[in-house]
Amino acid sequence: MQATAVVETASNKGYNNNGRNIQKDEPSHHKKENLLSPNGCKEAKLTFLNDYYDSLALEKRANDKEISNIDKIDLLEPSFTMSPDTNIESAHSQSSEFEDNIDYAFLNETYTIHYSESKLKSESLIHLNSELDSEMQKREEVFFDILEHQGDKITDLERIYKISYDDYKKTAEDVQKPDIDEDSQQEYHSAEEQECINNHLSFDQAKTLDIPNLEVLGLRNSGCEVKCVSNLEDSHVKLESNSSISLDSVDVYGQEDSPSVSKLQNSVTLRAFHEPKYEKCKEQGTSLMLHTVLDEIILRSSHLEHKESESKGFLNPQKALKTKIYTHKVNPQLTESKDSIGNVIVEDKMLQHLDNPGTLPQDKHLETLLQPCKDCQTSSVFDDSVISASGYSHYESLQSTPNPALDVSITLPRSAIRGNQAVEESGSLKVANGNTISKAHFHNMEGPCPKSETDAAGCTVTVDQTVDVSTDFRACFTASRATSARSSVVSTSSNTEITMMNKKRPSEWQSEKQRSVACNTDWSYIQDTEDPQMAMTKGPTGKSLSVDNLKPNGNVLNKDSLELKTFEFTDLKKHSESMLQIQVEKNLPSKCCQQIMQRAIQAESHLLNVHYQLCHRHCSDIYRLVMEDREGLNRNLSSNSTRKELGSALLSVLGDLKVRYMNLKEKINKGIPLEELPPLSIESRLLSAFSTFASRLMKEESHIFSGADSELDNQSTRDVGSSSLKKTLSQTSLLLDNGHPKQDKSPEEGGLKNGDINVDLSQLKLDDKDCKNYREVSEDWFDAKENLTGADFSGIQENQIEQDKGDPKFTLAEIKNVEPLRKDKGYLMHVGGLCPSVSEADLRSYFQKYEISDISIYDSSPNYRYASLAFKKNSDAKMAVKEMNGIEIKGKSVNVRLVKTPGEYTPLSSKNGNKVSFSNLEKSTSKEMSSPSSVSRLPRTRPRQPGSEQDSEFFPFDQKGVKKNCKQIESTKLLPDTPIQFIPPKTLNLRSFTKIIKRLAELHPEVSRHRDHIIDALQEVRVNHKGFLNGLSINTIVEMTSSVLENSASS
């Protein structure tokens, strides 16, 4: 294996290439270097005087020195040359032993480095002596002094060293451990072992490297070790721009010479290459330990000026960079962490503590140095290389100085290696993704260093090159734009990994991705915020493309030459601001959704409040209507206790309404939609006086009621508490129009097809003059809404219209007395217009030839009395109505009317005996509604005739209250000469009652033929629920009625 280096010297120095030795023109410094080569590894030690370096570092030599010649010297066998005018030129030469394993050492298109040989004198180590000072035999120092490039003048390194392969091999064999086998390269060290190894380490004052331009030195050898001993107290290392350093395996460490000299031992592992033909390396299995002084390097961006050198043919980005090296005290620590992939294990055994950093100026225009700021977070785009390697590590954060030209801060990655392990710290943004570290084990090849007689302190730089025992990893090296350039770490075998064990993983590494080296991934930290130009170098799958497919235009790292060039950085600060804006925009939809949700909640709350106000006003209106009617109030609510009970009932209903309202409002505020909540309703617990009062109002307004009308009227007034009063009055007004058809018809037996007869009303009353106009009307059970049709009142006699005002109404006592008659299934007959002196015995004497089961007399008012007679047979009732209507009892004629009981489906007979079914009823009603004579006449202010015969159903009332509160009743009052067809809503929607009857008939087939039993059960359920079925579901009504039927059947 051959390793060649091209070295460029100043014009005042000359060197001769003599095979394996390099002879200088000065005879006093002509020395031959020995090379250590364990397993094909070479070690080269380069030394420079501190004094000479100081003289180079403290003055500008951009205009004082010129390049006189470029010597090309082989380190081993025949060498190759690289011309500065070409980007990449390589000449391959082979040696007798390593014929197929030639590695190329390329510098960045601008500079070449020549090594001159010098021989070490102690313990198998090659000590390279500088030609300017003989006192360097005690201590070996290497200073890579890359002079600043101004314009077209370039000053390179001033020393050329040649490394002898044979001597290097002998020295390496002395150090080689014979008991190391092939597997010893894959070695894990525990925390205790590393702690014992590293306890003697300490760190001294940091040295500052002021770098005018971004540079990286690149060496490509299979085995090379460079050791340096120096203590840079007043020295700088000036790196020229656009030069690159890429070492396969580098170990630079400082050895402790005296108490004042600090020892810097960190391990940085760079990429190592191995040819498959290295049989000797496979047998010996030597594992080398690499150490480096590079502890913490921070490159600061300065003014950049781009110039091209026509003679050199390279790109000068001219980025003025400032670098500080801080030495720390290291205590070995051991932690272990694995990512989810499980391919990479990183072991870190170092604690770094920044202590007394030293800062030295290099140039006048670069005298301003960034001072360390402890425990300070900066606002720079870069995270200022703040990485904590363990729980006790402490790093100082330096704020990056943005470049005025590019407005970007450039930070060079830091390499800190400790205890045979490698850690690379990136000085870029967050260390986020794509960190590849391979496990490698290296042996420390430290040797005694001769003491120097000079006053200058020394620093030892050792470069070890490790041989890969498995394969040649010549993979693509891509450089991340986020961190400029950094060295890569390659495992010594395809299956080995470096284990970094941190007691506390740095916060920057928490989101990193680690990939295997075999996947051709670099050790760059892929940032969350990627450069737009860098994104172009990635394929569609997000992986880095091979640099073979990219042109070497200065923006990529070539795979063959390993020549790393500088990148042009975009304004990451602006990019981060744009990312913040994007993040804010992403949060906008959630805020909009929250606002929309809030508005929806407010709208539903407002709607609920409106519903609550309607219900509240409904109850208040009912109470006000009752209290305003003085006559009805005095008659029905005679006692103060009854009035108090009325008020307490109203307050109770309003209190329950408010509680339900607050509960619903709270649920809406919690986000429950209003449509998923039960509706806000009122459960009426009003007194019977409400029903009596509302019934009286409706009867007074209609003037004429049939028996069916009166029955439906009582039902609708009972349901006032659960539906609005206006709605009930409107339905009642519609009922009035249906009461008296023109033709004399009577229903057939079983003619009520749909079961739509009203089964829950108190009584049906037939006027003696209106028996021929009788018609049955139905009610919707579930909604307690009367779907009735209009009727013609043209056949009403004038005397009845005049008498309607004075007819009294049923009282609550009458309704209660009728209940036992229902159970007896008797036929009721209404006798109205009785004089006050008529008694029950008088009525029995008049109706004694008819089988009367019961007689009841009611006093609605002092001027109006009526009686209800119950007959056992229908024929007797019909005969009594026919014969007794209009007779005088004690000097006063009475009106006799037949009333069908609620529990009887048997049709009632009229005078002429004609029959009509319910279906015919609807048809005839529709025909009559279309006729002009179907308009009802409802006089508003017709004066009452005190001495006239009055129908027993009516009594006077306050007309103003009706006009004020019953607008829907007035809407049905039309002019006599204006014919109009009135069609009430839901005329044909009578399904609720039919459903109930049908389901009960299916559940109880034994009583399905006798529907009166089902009706009786429904009435009993209604009575048990205080006379209200409104609000109950059909299923609930069916279940309750079914239970009543079962109990009656069992009894």
UniProtKB/Swiss-Prot annotation:
Segments of skewed composition (Polar residues): 1-21, 907-923
Subcellular location: Cytoplasm
Domain RRM as annotated: residue spans: 827-901
Residues recorded as bearing Phosphoserine in the entry: 385, 388, 546, 716, 722
The protein's assembly and partners: Homodimer. Interacts with TEX14.
GO biological process terms on file: mRNA splicing, via spliceosome
Signal peptide as annotated in the record: none
Function according to Swiss-Prot or TrEMBL: Component of intercellular bridges during meiosis. Intercellular bridges are evolutionarily conserved structures that connect differentiating germ cells. Not required for fertility.
One MF annotation (Gene Ontology) recorded for this entry: protein homodimerization activity
Compositional bias ranges of the Low complexity kind: 927-936
Protein's recorded name: RNA-binding protein 44
PROSITE patterns assigned: RRM
UniProt keyword terms in alphabetical order: Cytoplasm, Phosphoprotein, RNA-binding
Biological classification of the source: Eukaryota, Metazoa, Chordata, Craniata, Vertebrata
Transmembrane segments annotated in the record for this chain: none
